[in-house]
Design a protein with these regions (language model features):
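Flexible "arm" and connector segments at domain edges
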Residues: 1-80, 84-147
Length: 147
């Protein structure tokens, strides 16, 4: 099943787009992405809440190891995959590859935390003290307004 093997982020994005319905306006498609991200993120948050705050705990794989209410890690992983799907199609709708999104994010984090994350660096972030990140984004504001 080599056609399902993912070697690079852009490879994943290309395969994920096979199931994306890109009909309608850009605004409508982005709304679909945002609602999908919200829904899938909510499912991850609910699983974590039940595992930690309701005392269900996590179980490896699908096996609950004596606790029938334990949250299977594989179920959480599936939801994280759904989030990745919506990030992928959202990036596509805005004209970006997943590779570009990943690079923009890594550059942002490197500028925000040049010495790595620390509580002090988080409190005194350099990227919010008048410095710009120097990242280059595509301007889709006109495209979004047209659709």
């Amino acid at each position: 099943m080599d056609e399902l093997r993912i070697n690079e982020l852009n490879d994943y994005q290309e395969k994920a787009l096979r199931t994306w319905k890109s009909a309608g306006s850009l605004e409508s498609r982005l709304q679909n992405v945002a609602l999908g991200l919200s829904g899938e993120s909510g499912e991850v948050a609910d699983a974590v809440k039940k595992a930690i705050h309701h005392g269900h705990g996590f179980s490896q794989g699908y096996i609950t190891a004596g606790n029938p209410k334990a949250i299977p890690v594989k179920e959480v992983i599936k939801e994280l995959g759904d989030i990745m799907y919506y990030v992928s199609v959202g990036a596509h709708e805005l004209g970006y590859t997943l590779q570009e999104i990943a690079e923009i994010n890594i550059n942002k984090l490197a500028k925000r935390y040049p010495e790595g994350f620390s509580v002090e660096a988080s409190i005194n972030r350099v990227d919010v003290q008048g410095e710009t990140l120097g990242l280059h984004y595509k301007d889709y504001s006109k495209e979004i307004r047209k659709n």
